[in-house]
Structure formats: C-alpha cells, structure tokens
Amino acid sequence: MGAQWKAKGKAQAADARGKLFGRLAKDIMVAARGGADPASNSRLRLVVEQARKVSMPKDTLERAIKKGAGLTGEAVHFEHVMYEGFAPHQVPVMVECLTDNVKRTAPEMRVLFRKGHLGASGSVAWDFDHVGMIEAEPVVAGSDPEVAAIEAGAEDFEPGHEEGTTLFLTAPTDLDLVSRALPAQGFTVISAKLGYKPKNPIDPASLDPAHLEEVEAFLAAIDANDDVQNVFVGLAG
C-alpha cells in the first residue's frame, strides 16, 4: 500500500482495469490541454505511454487526445481537487479527484468519509511527500535497480506494486527526465505519475485484522467513486 492504494483480488482487479481506462482517458484529456502532440507535451507523453502499456484501445486514446486538445468542438473541463482525512482507525488518506462538477463530488466525498474523518486542506498533507512515482520492470532478470536509480537520477527506489517491478521515486520536476533515462538502464517504464508517499506509514500488522478490513473496505468505497483518480494511504507495505 505505502503510497497508492490498489484493489486486490481477481474480481476487484478486473473491475479496476475497467475503471483504469476511464481514469486514463481523463488524464489524457487534461494533459492534452497543453497540446495534442506527445513529442512536445511531456505530460501527455507519459500518460499516453501508460495507456499503451495497459492496452487502451487506440480509438479511445486518440479520441481523448482530440477532445482534450479542443479538436472535436466539445467543451471539456475537469477540475483537480484533493480531499484529505483519515480512514477508520486514524489511517491518513489523500484522495485525488478529477471532476466536471465539484458540487457533486464534494458531498459524495463527505458521505464516503463518514466512516472515517474528512479533514481540511493541509490536515494530513504534511505527513506525505509529493513525489514522482515511476513503476518499471527489468528488461532482463538481474538488472540492478539501485544502479538504475543512481544513473537515471531517481532519489530512491522500492519494490513496486506488481511482482517483479520497482517503484522509482523522483522529485516532481524530474519525473519526465528519469522516466526517459530508465530504459537505457535496463528498465521498461510501466507508469509514471505524480503522487504522495507517506512519511510515517503505519504497519498494517499493528492493526487488528478486523480493523484492517474496515480500512480496506473504506478505501475500496472511496476508490469506486467515478471522480476519484488516485487514493494515497499512510500504510506500509
């Protein structure tokens, strides 16, 4: 968990994959505001590469780029909103949303946080570092992530969310630079985004199993909301 929370289990993973395309389409539309050409728009390039890695249909990807760049004549406006607070049992949470209607999203978040606590802006942000997060896998077995991190300019690294992957951590401004440098160090980039890493993560083993289940259920409910892009949680592991 440690940084970005992800659904577990086959059914949840399949459902999460379906949601992933919708979330990536939003990210693409927002990034495309800066131009429809990934070659000259690094933010768009990163999310397009991620979309291709997860096999987003080409027509869906291209439609999102055109829509975001204003080439279809459709008005597209998504607002980036962060919600901060605590899951049950005082586990800090940061929820990143892209919404076309904050007046809809805000009350939905208040309802979802009833089993925890919705805080004011900055209430838990102090306990997270804003970082670049690059998940990558070795091209060949035995590639050294420490050497790759040093040579590519990453600040740190740790095991990734998926088995066999590495999560490279960067300064926010170095995200694109490091993601471009990693392939030369023997790592294929799976995803690259800005996110929040907890400074003082709670060990899940320190929670009663029933309490941990309550935390997981809370996070799953938050993640299921259509306006939620990412959920960052202060749990280790």
Swiss-Prot record:
Gene Ontology annotations for the cellular component aspect, listed alphabetically: cytoplasm
Subcellular location: Cytoplasm
Keyword Transcription regulation: yes
Alphabetical list of InterPro entries matching this protein: Integrase-like_N, TACO1_YebC-like_2nd/3rd_dom, TACO1_YebC_N, Transcrip_reg_TACO1-like, Transcrip_reg_TACO1-like_dom3, YebC-like
UniProt record, GO biological process: regulation of DNA-templated transcription
Entries under Pfam families matching the protein: TACO1_YebC_N (PF20772), Transcrip_reg (PF01709)
Keywords: Cytoplasm, DNA-binding, Transcription, Transcription regulation
Annotated TM spans: none
Main localization of the protein described in the UniProt heading: cytoplasm
Database matches in SUPFAM superfamilies: YebC-like
GO MF annotations in UniProt: DNA binding
Keyword flag Cytoplasm: yes
Family that this chain belongs to: Belongs to the TACO1 family.
NCBIfam families: PRK12378.1
Stated name of the protein: Probable transcriptional regulatory protein Bpro_2928
Organism expressing this protein natively: Polaromonas sp. (strain JS666 / ATCC BAA-500)
Lineage: Bacteria, Pseudomonadati, Pseudomonadota, Betaproteobacteria, Burkholderiales
